[in-house]
């Protein structure tokens, strides 16, 4: 069952993503998990390499000062430098650059991408576990109306894009930003210490003593960086909104393309390329409009950042040391070294400005992920979840298997409606009974089967299932996932639960002996089984699954619609022979129900839907199929 009313009210619900419904909960979930040693171990290595990179920035500034000073004094009349000294300084600078970029930065990138890969994999497993749980959360999220989830985005759109792209972008962005924060802190420590160490007095600021030039550097940074940071934050807010819109538009367009590829035959058969082309144009128009706005903002931000970098590195960085240099308190080498250190401080403090687009994307990705986590948690109580869009008072219970299946005062409704479109009083299907479910097309036969199996959200009444009896629901539309043929037969069991011989025997009994050698294959000729098999072959595959799993309670929704009369009889006879004692409820549109080769009836009774009411009669009373109201009501 999808949900049981008694158990839902008694047990608290918690999913594998419960802690990820807030920004910081999402950020820290991995670091507090059972993989914390892996996470913190990689993080520690990254911090150490970041510290070494910060120290290398100090070495770089000192080496740059030595090289510029050596070049400046090459033609000094009293104490000229030699070419050997210049080459030695250049070699030292080159060595520092190689060690910093290759030994520190490149290896840090390797460890950070490894952390990115492992963090993403952990989150991917958690969200897949939450969506593909026994509560069928993925189904509820797809069925829920837009107003069913009280979040800003309601039922999350493009769940695939959120799990694939948003998680990847969020984890990568978070790691990059964390490295940036660590780099700023460590660089301020090492570079700031060097600035204080090389500080000197400045005229007019004698009361600061030897810390005069250091204070000037701090003042220049404090005056320059915050104003620019505020402007960057405003632009970042706009970019975050555009990023969210862009992800939604891209996800919708990709979803329609994927749907086309899965249904290309139906589009071709209906000559629906024009309609599909129009849909794609509308989807891409949304992408293009959002992209244009994003490009304008990116260009504005790029111009702002380039101007900011130039003034910071060429004017602000060199200004604090200019006064003591003019007063001849420091040498040219000390002046250049101080300017490079000031430039490093400005770059570090400007980290927020440089990564503002990344922060905007991080927040956009995190918002889409946390909204999905909220929706997953919200759908853990399906009755309350669906009650926001209509009556959701269906109750599910269990009873002794010998009493079979019982339906009590059942009413099925559409979202937002108060009147039922299908009603049933007290109905009982005995253990081992075969019951035919008939009614006009659209009268609610499939909806009734869905409701019995917990897949219809709105209505009232009680459904009592036999306890500890395996059920199998064969839906009307058969869509096969891209897995091996054996896995398709074994669903919902694990593939290891049944031997190759058992699976091969089930295939043969179902009339698919030609495919026995392909049990381990996921298709043929670059086509999946869903693309390769015909409608009749898919129904035979469902029969093979039934024969392998041997359920005690079987629900069939037009199971032989693609089979001829002889194959239909063989289908029913195989179930009768190999699933002895099973209870069967089957939807069929045939004018007369099938009989065995000896003329015996397969079915014992009939559930008839007429004028929206379900009644049960013996099979002998079946005359013609009744006419009922359409299941999908026309809008007024």
Residue ranges and their predicted role:
Residues 48, 61, 104-105, 179-210, ...:
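A hydrophobic transmembrane-helix motif
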Residues 1-57, 69-93, 108-112, 138-185, ...:
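Membrane-integrated ABC transporters
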Residues 146-151, 481, 503, 510-541, ...:
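ABC-fold ATPase nucleotide-binding domain signature/coupling loops
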Residues 266-272, 316, 336-382:
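Cytosolic ends of transmembrane helices, especially the final helix of ABC transmembrane type-1 domains
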């Amino acid at each position: 069952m999808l949900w049981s009313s008694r158990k839902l009210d008694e047990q608290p619900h918690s999913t594998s993503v419960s802690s990820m419904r807030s920004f910081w909960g999402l950020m820290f979930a991995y670091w507090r998990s059972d993989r914390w040693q892996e996470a913190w171990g990689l993080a520690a290595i990254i911090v150490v390499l970041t510290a070494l990179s910060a120290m290398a920035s100090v070495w770089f500034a000192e080496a740059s000062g030595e090289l510029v000073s050596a070049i400046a004094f090459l033609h000094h009349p009293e104490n000229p430098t030699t070419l050997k000294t210049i080459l030695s300084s250049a070699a030292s600078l080159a060595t520092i650059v190689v060690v910093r970029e290759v030994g520190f930065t490149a290896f840090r990138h390797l460890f950070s991408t490894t952390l990115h890969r492992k963090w993403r994999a952990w989150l991917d497993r958690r969200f897949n576990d939450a969506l593909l749980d026994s509560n069928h959360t993925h189904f509820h999220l797809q069925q829920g109306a837009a107003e069913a989830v009280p979040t800003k985005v309601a039922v999350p759109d493009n769940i695939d894009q959120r799990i694939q792209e948003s998680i990847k972008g969020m984890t990568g962005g978070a790691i990059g930003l964390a490295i940036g924060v660590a780099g700023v802190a460590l660089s301020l420590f090492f570079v700031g210490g060097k600035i204080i160490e090389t500080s000197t007095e400045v005229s007019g600021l004698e009361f600061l003593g030897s810390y005069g030039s250091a204070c000037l550097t701090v003042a220049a940074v404090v005056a320059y960086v915050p104003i620019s940071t505020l402007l960057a934050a405003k632009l970042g807010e706009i970019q975050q909104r555009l990023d969210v819109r862009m992800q939604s538009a891209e996800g919708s367009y990709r979803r329609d393309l994927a749907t086309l590829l899965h249904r290309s035959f139906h589009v071709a058969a209906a000559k629906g390329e024009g309609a599909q082309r129009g849909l794609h144009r509308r989807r891409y128009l949304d992408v293009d409009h959002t992209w244009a706005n994003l490009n304008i903002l990116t260009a504005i931000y790029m111009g702002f950042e380039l101007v900011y970098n130039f003034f910071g590195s060429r004017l602000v960085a060199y200004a604090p040391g200019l006064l003591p240099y003019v007063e001849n308190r420091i040498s040219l080498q000390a002046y250049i070294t101080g300017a490079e250190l000031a430039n490093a401080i400005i770059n570090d403090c400007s980290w927020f400005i440089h990564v503002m687009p990344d922060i905007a994307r991080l927040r956009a990705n995190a918002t889409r992920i946390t909204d999905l986590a909220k929706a997953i948690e919200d759908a853990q109580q399906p009755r309350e979840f669906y009650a926001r869009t209509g009556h959701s008072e269906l109750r599910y219970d269990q009873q002794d298997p010998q009493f079979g299946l019982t339906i009590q005062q059942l009413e099925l409704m559409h979202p937002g409606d108060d009147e039922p479109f299908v009603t049933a009083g007290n109905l009982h299907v005995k253990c081992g009974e075969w019951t035919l479910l008939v009614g006009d097309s659209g009268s609610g036969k499939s909806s009734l089967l869905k409701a019995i199996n917990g897949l219809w959200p709105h209505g009232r009444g009680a459904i009592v299932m036999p306890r500890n009896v395996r059920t199998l629901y064969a839906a009307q539309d058969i869509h096969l996932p891209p897995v091996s043929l054996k896995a398709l037969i074994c669903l919902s069991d694990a593939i290891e639960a049944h031997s190759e011989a058992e699976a091969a025997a089930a295939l043969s009994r179902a009339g698919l002996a030609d495919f026995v050698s392909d049990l381990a294959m996921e298709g043929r000729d670059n086509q999946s089984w869903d693309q390769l098999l015909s409608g009749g072959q898919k129904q035979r595959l469902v029969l093979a699954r039934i024969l392998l799993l041997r359920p005690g309670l079987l629900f069939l929704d037009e199971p032989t619609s693609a089979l001829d009369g002889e194959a239909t009889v063989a289908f029913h006879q195989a179930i009768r022979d190999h699933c002895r004692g099973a209870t069967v409820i089957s939807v069929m549109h045939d004018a007369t129900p099938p009989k065995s080769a000896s003329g015996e009836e397969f079915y014992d009774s009939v559930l008839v839907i007429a004028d929206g009411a379900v009644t049960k009669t013996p099979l002998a009373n079946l005359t013609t199929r009744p006419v009922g109201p359409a299941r999908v009501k026309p809008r007024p």
